[in-house]
Amino acid sequence: MKKFYLYILFCLVLIPSPSFAMKNDVLVSSETKYYKTIYESDSNVFVLSNVVDKTIEISEQEYNDVYDDVKVMESNSNQTSYKKIAISIYKSGNDFKYEVNLEWKKIPKVRSNDIIAIGFDNKNIKANGNYSFIQNFCTSDGCKSNNSYSLRTFSTGSSATFSLPTSSLTYLNQIFSFTVVKKITEKIISQTISGDYSHATSKININNALKHSVDVDSGIKLYNSISSYYDSIPVTKTTWTGSW
């Protein structure tokens, strides 16, 4: 057991820094939330089409106390996943950078096309590009990264849709970020952004997974035709106040 946990620690050391922040980026606002999602099937056999999920916010202590983080969620009719989501605002030169970071405490059983997103108030700002996405994961062969994703942009936010690795994993996290600029000449004294994540609990192809929008209050807004394919967590918000 001791060797096992030493191996996990070794893998974590090899994982790239969990942020897209550059040397000159300054963190000015952030919020971290911890969630537990319980998946229940209405039969003794776990059938993907009849899964009901319930998500509740938990404390950092409860999240950290889940010691069996390297196990895939159980294959019986009741499963529990734990997620940590962090949403951050960075001062980046004359502009700002938004970032959302999702970390899994337990590796999800279903691996399909998931969605990570950032919503923002578009009254005074607009996205300026510089989109970045990375998925960090560890297997028995070591730790790797993948930056393959499909981008969706809206006036009120942006999202990255991506496929989860299908191999046996011991660690998994995703990071998405982009920069924003002012679209007014007047001074801006506050910015509010939100981070959100939708995990596919059923197999769904990429074309259908892209059927969503993003805004600051609702986070990821799935079209009705695909809403039953995903679980959900509450939107996590952070607000910066100052002078820009």
Listing of model-derived features with the role each one plays in the protein:
Residues 17-19, 33, 158:
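N-terminal cationic amphipathic segment used for targeting or macromolecule association
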Residues 1-2, 59, 205:
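Serine/threonine-rich low-complexity intrinsically disordered regions
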Residues 1-23:
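Sec-dependent N-terminal signal peptides of Gram-positive bacterial secreted proteins and lipoproteins
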Residues 22-84, 88:
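N-terminal propeptides/leader regions of secreted preproproteins
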Residues 4-5, 9-10, 48, 230, ...:
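Homeobox/homeodomain signature
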Residues 71-244:
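Mature secreted bioactive peptide module from preproproteins
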Residues 2-6, 30-37, 239:
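Intrinsic low-complexity, intrinsically disordered segments enriched in polar/basic residues
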